Amino acid sequence: MCLSTVYKNKMEPETIVMRNVMHIQCKDGCVILTDLMDRQVAIEGTLEEANLVDGFVIVKEK
């Protein structure tokens, strides 16, 4: 199982949006994140980068 930490705009500790993300969906200009506990966060923006080997995702906020 590949779990990732999602960051907003840049990869820095203070920009972490969610950890242990297991599902990412891009829909209607939003990136919807779901973690292991089935919690969801929606960010208005686009998926900028996803590195599943290193376990990080960067979402560019609008």
Where are these regions (language model features)?
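Compact, glycine-rich, soluble single-domain proteins
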Residues: C2, V6-K62
